[in-house]
């Protein structure tokens, strides 16, 4: 009831015990506000069902004041709803301690309270709790945490960038990989790892409006991140005073935000830890003028600690535009365009020297002199060793140069030339006659590029006169699909109406099973369509996608792509091919392009193929060429002299070749080496694949499902269907769907079946289930019969699980150093600890369940003996706890000191290292060591064993 809560009272959260002791701040209507001073968190609960337990101590309990002194309670007084404790301090002096002054770090022995209250859990739950602790501990210490759970093939350069960036405090970097190398995945990995580690809690993602859906799909499908998509309608309809404050991850279209000052004010007021901006190269900047979009992002970058900019490659942008992105990251470091140009020229000969070392294995006198001039006297010994053929010295030399690279810590840029694993492409053009029905269509935007849309727009026609009855591209498509029978074919067209009509055409005219995929469908409907296409045995041969509908999707299990029409921009063309042409594609991409002869379609095909070479290769110059030649291109597409057209194509080809030559000579191999990770990323790939092959997760999840009443049944090979049973223990179990869900632990299966949940240790279902076990009391008491002939019947053993717990903000990541692994002791009647001689699994195999009533009866009869032994258990385990805490402090200090030394040394030769980064690391070291000093032992679980 509402009146039981008073400001100043101390309560503990039933679901988030790690927050420490809570203080009631306010009771407002139906809401209760609680502050947790230990972590700085504030929570609001419904008054009717707040998951809180009142903190009351009894005479005999020892409690701690927030200044550190202890009080043994003699008497408890209730004054206006607030507890006041009277007793003796450590010097046996009488003291009074109001509950408002209790230490925020006090722990509770809830397991013993439940045991003596008769709340005894099933035996299997105790094992589940122990295993949950062990798995949680292992994952928190893993170098793969936040990297291995992505629904994607692990790729070395992506993992290297993600770890390098996500492990920084408030990273401020530019991701400028070439198209097809997965910048969005890199950004998602950084976001995911920062969220899991606690380095970031609130993330703002700014994207162009046409990419909102792609980001929504990518973040949800690949990382299970629930992103809130904001637009004008959602913002206006929200009842909240600031709609952005309710979203941990917000996805916002930059176009809307620039035009809505009220939304801008709310966005700034909401507070964010990490800003991610996609397509950052579209932010226009000149020395004397900036665009509204650039100005807005600049303001946000000044108040948000972490900034991630995704952009085209620096070579595509030009140096001035590249400088504009770097200004957003660090305006103090990049403040003068002329100085930046000079610095870039300074690094060019060094990069060329490194290229020579990599290609030739040795340095010419000129390259030797260049590097010596760059490194100074300290480089002499290294260069001498390189000259003697020392390969380790070569690697060290390259590392030294990387550390000194002007933008090496803020810019990551991988190229297809430097990354292996891309497929080849083959082009199959099909010129077809233009039907009479398309000759005199009304003019419209690109009407002759998409004549079927213009034809349909004229009005209703009889079924036998629909465009797909006479368009030769449809006849060609049916024949091609029959020729490629049992081969998966992806068909992409510009418009959703065309996609739906093509599905009708295939069904009516051929009976070929097809699935359709367009922006008018919900995400769930698209998932089902994609799954039907992906199914090898019973699925559709063909998936027909609209332009927008296919954004962000990956169909690399197919390698035949039909472009039923051509898009109006080369970036969209590359996006289409990119649905199949990705790292990991095992086959040559077959591009099938039907087009109508003597029409704008034919000329557009020639423009892309002969002018831009955009079919057979990626086209990094496509955007620049389209911009440069656009005024000549558009009129000539619709008509015009053949000679003028041929001249345009020839001019575009010459300009493309010139730009490509510039790109090649301007390649910065030093930067590519740094971005690729030089072997570190490959080690992460191998570790993730090794983790994928282990059975620990499926075995653990079966016990978790069993405990919570989740039924699992086979769906197909490597896949299970999960459904809530009638005996489901907790409705809050994060199943994801009340009706049930299909899961797989197999990465390959998950990549081809997007309708299945891909379960890893990072998945919300796994993490949520583990949290339910550990945050509540599940399995923290048990009584069992032990069958062992070496034990005299009636012998009582007491198994205690303790956890070394530190209450601290997640951003300190103290779980990496002091994870919640179980400290176990097994006490006999004489108080001897047998745990080192009897392993948990060995003991488990000898146990049998005891009826709850009998178990409770035994516990009550032995209460005094058990209570004494429980209190003695803490003394037994205390040395192990102190050792773990000391080791955690040593590890934290060693890691922080090593990183500090590296950054300080690096700052001396590379101004990209910010003072704020070094200061933040120093503070994190100090705060972490101070928090570890307060680590306390918590009794996690008790199991009473009776020999029989």
Curated annotation (Swiss-Prot):
Family annotation (SMART domains) = DEXDc (SM00487), HELICc (SM00490)
The record's annotation in SUPFAM superfamilies points to: P-loop containing nucleoside triphosphate hydrolases (SSF52540)
Domain Helicase ATP-binding residue range list: 164-332
EC numbers for this chain = 3.6.4.-
- Family recorded in the similarity comment: Belongs to the SNF2/RAD54 helicase family. RapA subfamily.
Q: What does this protein do?
A: Transcription regulator that activates transcription by stimulating RNA polymerase (RNAP) recycling in case of stress conditions such as supercoiled DNA or high salt concentrations. Probably acts by releasing the RNAP, when it is trapped or immobilized on tightly supercoiled DNA. Does not activate transcription on linear DNA. Probably not involved in DNA repair.
Protein name listed in UniProt: RNA polymerase-associated protein RapA
User: Source species, please?
Assistant: Pseudomonas putida (strain ATCC 47054 / DSM 6125 / CFBP 8728 / NCIMB 11950 / KT2440)
């Amino acid at each position: 009831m509402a009146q039981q809560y008073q400001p100043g009272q101390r309560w503990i959260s039933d679901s988030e015990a790690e927050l420490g002791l809570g203080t009631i701040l306010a009771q407002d209507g139906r809401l209760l506000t609680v502050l947790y001073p230990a972590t700085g968190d504030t929570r609001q609960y419904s008054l009717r069902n707040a998951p809180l337990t009142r903190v009351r101590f009894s005479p005999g309990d020892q409690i701690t004041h927030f200044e550190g002194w202890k009080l043994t309670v003699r008497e408890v007084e209730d004054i206006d709803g607030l507890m006041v404790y009277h007793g003796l301090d450590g010097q046996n002096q009488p003291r009074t301690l109001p509950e408002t002054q209790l230490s925020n770090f006090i722990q509770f022995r809830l397991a013993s309270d439940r045991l003596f209250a008769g709340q005894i859990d099933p035996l299997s739950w105790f094992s589940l709790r122990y295993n949950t602790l062990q798995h949680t501990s292992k994952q928190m210490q893993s170098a793969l945490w936040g990297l291995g759970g992505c629904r994607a093939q692990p790729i070395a350069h992506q993992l290297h960038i993600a770890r390098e960036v996500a492990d920084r405090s408030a990273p401020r970097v530019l991701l400028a990989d070439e198209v097809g190398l997965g910048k969005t995945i890199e950004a998602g990995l950084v976001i995911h790892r920062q969220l899991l580690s606690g380095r970031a809690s609130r993330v703002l993602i700014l994207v162009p409006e046409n990419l909102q859906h792609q980001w929504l799909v990518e973040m949800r499908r690949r990382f299970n991140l629930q992103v809130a998509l904001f637009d004008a309608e959602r913002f206006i309809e929200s009842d909240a005073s600031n709609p952005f404050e309710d979203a941990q991850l917000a996805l916002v279209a930059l176009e809307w935000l620039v035009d809505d000052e009220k939304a801008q004010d709310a966005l700034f007021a909401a507070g964010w830890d990490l800003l991610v901006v996609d397509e950052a190269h579209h932010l226009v900047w000149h020395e004397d003028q900036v665009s509204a979009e650039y100005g807005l992002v600049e303001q946000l970058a000044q108040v948000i600690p972490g900034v991630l900019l995704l952009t085209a490659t620096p070579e595509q942008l030009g140096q001035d535009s590249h400088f504009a992105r770097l200004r957003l990251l660090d305006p103090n470091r990049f403040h003068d365009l002329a100085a930046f140009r000079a610095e870039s020229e300074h690094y060019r000969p060094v990069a060329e020297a490194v290229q020579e070392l990599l290609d030739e294995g040795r340095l010419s006198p000129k390259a030797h002199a260049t590097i010596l001039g760059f490194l100074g006297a300290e480089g002499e010994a290294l260069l001498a060793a390189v000259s003697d053929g020392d390969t380790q010295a070569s690697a060290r030399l390259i590392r030294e140069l990387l550390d000194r690279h002007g933008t090496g810590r803020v810019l990551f840029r991988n190229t297809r030339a430097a990354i292996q694993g891309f497929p080849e492409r083959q082009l199959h053009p099909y010129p077809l006659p233009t039907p009479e029905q398309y000759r005199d269509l009304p003019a419209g935007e690109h009407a002759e590029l998409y004549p079927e849309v213009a034809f349909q727009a004229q009005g209703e026609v009889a079924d036998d006169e629909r465009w797909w009855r006479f368009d030769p591209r449809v006849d060609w498509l049916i024949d091609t699909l029959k020729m490629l029978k049992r081969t998966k074919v992806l068909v992409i067209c510009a418009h959703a109406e065309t996609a739906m009509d093509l599905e009708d055409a295939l069904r009516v005219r051929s009976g070929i099973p097809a699935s359709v995929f367009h922006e008018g469908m919900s995400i769930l409907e698209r998932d089902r369509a994609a799954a039907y296409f992906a199914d090898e045995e019973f699925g559709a041969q063909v998936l027909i996608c609209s332009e927008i509908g296919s954004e962000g999707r990956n169909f690399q299990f197919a390698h035949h792509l039909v472009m039923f029409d051509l898009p109006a921009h080369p970036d969209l063309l590359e996006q289409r091919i990119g649905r199949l042409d990705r790292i990991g594609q095992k086959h040559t991409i077959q591009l099938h392009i039907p087009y109508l002869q003597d029409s704008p379609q034919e000329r557009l095909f020639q423009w892309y193929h002969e002018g831009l070479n955009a079919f057979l290769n990626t086209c990094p110059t496509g955007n620049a060429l389209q911009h440069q030649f656009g005024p000549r291109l558009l009129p000539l597409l619709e008509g015009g002299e053949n000679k003028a057209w041929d001249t345009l194509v020839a001019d575009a080809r010459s300009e493309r070749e010139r730009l490509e030559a510039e790109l090649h000579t301007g390649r910065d191999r030093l930067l590519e080496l740094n971005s690729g990770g030089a072997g570190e990323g490959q080690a992460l790939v191998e570790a993730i694949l090794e983790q994928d092959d282990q059975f620990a997760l499926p075995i653990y999840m079966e016990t978790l499902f069993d405990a919570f009443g989740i039924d699992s049944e086979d769906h197909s090979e490597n896949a299970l269907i999960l459904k809530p049973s009638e005996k489901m223990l907790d409705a809050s179990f994060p199943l994801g769907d009340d009706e049930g869900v299909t899961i797989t632990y197999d990465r390959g299966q998950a990549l081809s079946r997007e309708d299945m949940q891909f379960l890893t240790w990072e998945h919300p279902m796994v993490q949520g289930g583990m949290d339910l076990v550990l945050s509540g009391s599940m399995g923290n008491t048990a009584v069992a019969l032990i069958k062992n002939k070496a034990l005299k019947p009636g012998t009582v053993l007491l198994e205690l699980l303790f956890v070394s717990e530190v209450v601290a903000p997640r951003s300190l990541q103290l779980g990496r150093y002091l994870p919640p692994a179980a400290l176990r002791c097994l006490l006999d009647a004489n108080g001897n600890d047998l745990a080192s001689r009897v392993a948990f699994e060995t003991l488990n195999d000898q146990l049998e369940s005891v009826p709850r009533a009998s178990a409770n009866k035994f516990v009550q009869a032995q209460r005094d003996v058990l209570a004494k032994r429980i209190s003695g258990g803490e003394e037994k385990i205390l040395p192990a706890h102190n050792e773990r805490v000391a080791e955690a402090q040593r590890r934290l200090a060693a890691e922080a000191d090593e990183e500090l030394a590296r950054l300080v040394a690096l700052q001396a030769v590379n101004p990209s290292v910010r003072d704020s980064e070094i200061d933040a690391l120093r503070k994190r070291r100090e705060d972490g060591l101070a928090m570890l000093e307060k680590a306390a032992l918590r009794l996690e679980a008790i199991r009473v064993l009776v020999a029989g």
